[in-house]
From Swiss-Prot:
The protein, known as: Cytochrome b
Pfam family, one: Cytochrome_B
Protein's UniProt keywords contain Iron-sulfur: no
Principal subcellular localization: mitochondrion
InterPro entries, sorted: Cyt_b/b6_C, Cyt_b/b6_C_sf, Cyt_b/b6_N, Cytb/b6-like_sf, Cytochrome_b, Cytochrome_b_N_euk/bac, Di-haem_cyt_TM
Taxonomic placement: Eukaryota, Metazoa, Chordata, Craniata, Vertebrata
Family matches, as PROSITE patterns: CYTB_CTER, CYTB_NTER
UniProt topology in membrane: Multi-pass membrane protein
Record's function text: Component of the ubiquinol-cytochrome c reductase complex (complex III or cytochrome b-c1 complex) that is part of the mitochondrial respiratory chain. The b-c1 complex mediates electron transfer from ubiquinol to cytochrome c. Contributes to the generation of a proton gradient across the mitochondrial membrane that is then used for ATP synthesis.
Single Gene Ontology MF annotation: ubiquinol-cytochrome-c reductase activity
Family statement: Belongs to the cytochrome b family.
This protein's UniProt keywords: Electron transport, Heme, Iron, Membrane, Metal-binding, Mitochondrion, Mitochondrion inner membrane, Respiratory chain, Transmembrane, Transmembrane helix, Transport, Ubiquinone
Amino acid sequence: MPHHYILKLFGLLPVATNISTWWNFGSMLLTCLTLQVATGFFLAVHYTANINLAFSSIVHMIRDVPYGWMMQNLHAIGASMFFICIYIHIARGLYYGSYMNKKTWMSGITLLITLMATAFFGYILPWGQMSFWAATVITNLLTAVPYLGTSLTTWLWGGFAINDPTLTRFFALHFILPFLIISLSSLHIILLHEEGSSNPLGTNPDFDKIPFHPYHSYKDFLMLTLMIMMLLIIMPFLPNIFNDPDNFSKANPLXXXXXXXXXXXXXXXXXILRSIPNKLGGVLALAASILVLFLMPLLHTSKLRSMTFRPLSQILFWTLVTNVLILTWVGSQPVEHPFIIIGQLASLTYFLIILVLFPLAALLENKLLKL
């Protein structure tokens, strides 16, 4: 069979019969990526990476380029969809113990970090008020690095402040990183197919597997259709639902935006960053909030892979989900009285649940279930 490998990749791949809708998000992410690369290319064709022209070039795209408004909206809304899907995909991995497939999990978290970097660079490109101040705030985090901080920041900016060289290099990075994402995704899929998908029971029933196509591919197609329908509803009716009003005015280095809130995608991480008053401490907490996911296979103390039969861990899991939603909400609010303390408590409970309560609950469940 000459095309054996390609067939094995999608057609003849043996998959458990009982995987649920939570397993459809991988193919949805692949579709998001394809959409982002396609629309991104057409946007890049009309974009000008110059601080005096960037904002105008996007206005020109939306107004004058045929279907430019569609490309721009699809790219912006598609990015938010990408993040919604990836967070659900990770939550599924946490719930069903998919992180026990270590190589796949590590490549996935690396993908998440690359994706967040790409989204940040993309957010800077329109050169609106929020773009400019987000760039200022986030790049200034590098100054928290001891000894090298200031030199690193100057090197990244290409000068002593955010200026034309900064925008040019951010555009270059935003263009090249998706290719890294594509290669990492391919690696992610290849590594997954080494061991095969998990399933809600957390078992590996080799005797009860069916081919991916046509059984699961049609199920994937259903969720894909729903996602594309959502995109096509949001695009014409609520195109600016994920945008920030401040980003509709051109960047002005002299007037700071009211509250520099990060994009919807990274609001959860931003809340953790600013809940710590110390600069270096905040940066470390920000990094730790994502890097802690690398530790998940080490923190797994249960004898059962999945949380399906572990009620205590389930309660903790849904508390963690709620916690992340609270962090996301706080991250989009101004830094004032109630939000500061809420953010600090939510950040604390985030790390507490992952690093302490999950392993302890699993040990207790082992005892209760006499495993």
